[in-house]
């Protein structure tokens, strides 16, 4: 197919939509390559308030103006893949074998990989029909905002939890986009259907959701579970059983109720991986961690945040069977964050063995932050 006329582009768009559904893409939408000026205001406000986490693309102008990252852009294609929200035969956390949880966005194979494969198929489809086409695809970590593109492309609207909500799949969707030099006709942007509902804002464990689709990402549990430093004690108290990520604002959303999608085999979770026992995590080697969890999105920060979070969860459960493992962490782990968090956990759990281990550590520990964990009064 040689595309030259506007009618040809319209036909190509319909062909591409049909192909997208054929390869397992749940939603596809099209928008212009115009600047995302509304996003610029929001980003500048966030920058002024020091709300960037460091996980975002650092150049605001490149997040707003597609022409800065792609020569003569004509349109942007957005896609959405729905993912599961419920486990089949979920393992039970029980005394002596407590478990933590990975958020749903870490179930199955890393979603970045799955989305990139779908976008690559769309790229091949277009190249076969339009040899001179130019494209730039991105997922999550690219310059553009996935939610902003998808919203303007008509796939869904930005909810008060800052996530994209679709009428069909709620917010249980992964997003990706492709900038092209093809002048596809844009779709109509989605309407905001949240109305007066504030359930996600009220349910947020840390108060990170500010309403009107705004948030303080630095106190979002999803972000905090991925940090590598000591976790502030006030956030340890609300960590509950989260090893990676947080789904609270999605679970309470009315548009997500009753939704559970199993369209993609790659996204099917291994229950033992997404709800693993905690104690074995404390001593897992780097190699074993990569072998067991390396294909999951939740492994991208390495084992340290997961281990720190596992220690905090064990303390919350006051799991006395974990005391020997925690003592070993306190005495032998070379990382101050793990030693200090283990010492805090031992004081939280209590008992003679735990208390004696902390007293011994106070005689030998040199790290100031670890010593603070060993002496501060736990809540």
Swiss-Prot record:
UniProt xrefs under InterPro entries: 4Fe4S_Fe-S-bd, 4Fe4S_Fe_S_CS, ARM-like, ARM-type_fold, PBS_lyase_HEAT, QueG, QueG_DUF1730
Residue numbers binding [4Fe-4S] cluster 2: 204, 220, 246, 249
HEAT-like PBS-type repeats: 307-332
Name of a matching Pfam family: Fer4_16
Biological pathway: tRNA modification; tRNA-queuosine biosynthesis
Free-text cofactor note: Binds 2 [4Fe-4S] clusters per monomer.
Catalytic activity: epoxyqueuosine(34) in tRNA + AH2 = queuosine(34) in tRNA + A + H2O
Principal localisation: cytoplasm
SMART domains: EZ_HEAT
Keywords tagged on the record: 4Fe-4S, Cytoplasm, Iron, Iron-sulfur, Metal-binding, Oxidoreductase, Queuosine biosynthesis, tRNA processing
Cofactor: cob(II)alamin; [4Fe-4S] cluster
Gene Ontology terms describing biological process: queuosine biosynthetic process; tRNA modification
Cell compartment(s), UniProt: Cytoplasm
GO MF: 4 iron, 4 sulfur cluster binding; epoxyqueuosine reductase activity; metal ion binding
Active site positions, chain numbering: 140 (proton donor)
Residue ranges of every copy of the 4Fe-4S ferredoxin-type domain listed in the record: 184-214
Assembly and oligomerization: Monomer.
PANTHER family listed in its UniProt record: EPOXYQUEUOSINE REDUCTASE
Function: Catalyzes the conversion of epoxyqueuosine (oQ) to queuosine (Q), which is a hypermodified base found in the wobble positions of tRNA(Asp), tRNA(Asn), tRNA(His) and tRNA(Tyr).
Similarity comment text for this entry: Belongs to the QueG family.
Protein name: Epoxyqueuosine reductase
Naturally occurring in which organism (per UniProt): Listeria monocytogenes serovar 1/2a (strain ATCC BAA-679 / EGD-e)
Lineage per the UniProt record: Bacteria, Bacillati, Bacillota, Bacilli, Bacillales
């Amino acid at each position: 197919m040689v595309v030259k006329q506007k009618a040809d582009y319209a036909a190509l768009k319909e062909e591409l939509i049909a192909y997208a559904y054929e390869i397992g893409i749940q939603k596809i939408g099209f928008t212009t390559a115009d600047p995302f000026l509304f996003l610029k205001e929001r980003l500048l406000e966030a920058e002024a308030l020091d709300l960037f986490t460091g996980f975002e693309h650092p150049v605001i102008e490149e997040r707003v103006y597609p022409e800065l990252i792609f020569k003569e852009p004509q349109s942007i294609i957005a896609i959405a893949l729905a993912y599961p929200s419920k486990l089949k035969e979920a393992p039970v956390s029980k005394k002596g074998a407590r478990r933590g949880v990975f958020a749903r966005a870490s179930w199955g194979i890393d979603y970045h990989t799955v989305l990139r494969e779908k976008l690559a198929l769309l790229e091949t489809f277009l190249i076969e029909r339009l040899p001179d086409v130019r494209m730039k695809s991105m997922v999550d970590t690219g310059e553009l905002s996935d939610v902003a593109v998808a919203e303007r492309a008509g796939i869904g609207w930005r909810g008060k939890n800052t996530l994209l909500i679709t009428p069909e799949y709620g917010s249980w969707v992964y997003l990706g986009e492709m900038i092209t030099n093809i002048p596809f006709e844009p779709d109509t942007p989605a309407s905001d259907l949240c109305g007066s509902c504030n359930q996600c804002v009220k349910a947020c464990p840390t108060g990170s959701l500010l309403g009107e689709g705004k948030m303080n990402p630095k106190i979002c549990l999803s972000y905090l579970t991925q940090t590598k430093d000591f976790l502030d004690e006030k956030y340890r108290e609300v960590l509950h059983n989260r090893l990676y990520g947080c789904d609270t604002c999605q679970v309470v959303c009315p548009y997500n109720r009753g939704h559970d999608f199993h369209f993609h085999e790659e996204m099917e979770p291994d229950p033992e991986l997404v709800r693993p026992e905690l104690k074995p995590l404390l001593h897992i080697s780097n190699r074993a961690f990569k072998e067991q969890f390396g294909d999951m999105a939740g492994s991208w920060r390495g084992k340290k945040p997961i281990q720190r979070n596992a220690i905090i969860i064990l303390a919350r459960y006051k799991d006395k069977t974990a005391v020997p493992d925690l003592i070993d962490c306190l005495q032998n782990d070379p990382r101050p964050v793990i030693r200090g968090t283990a010492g805090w956990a031992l004081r939280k759990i209590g008992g003679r063995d735990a208390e004696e281990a902390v007293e011994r550590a106070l005689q030998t520990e040199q790290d100031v932050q670890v010593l603070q964990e060993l002496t501060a009064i736990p809540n």
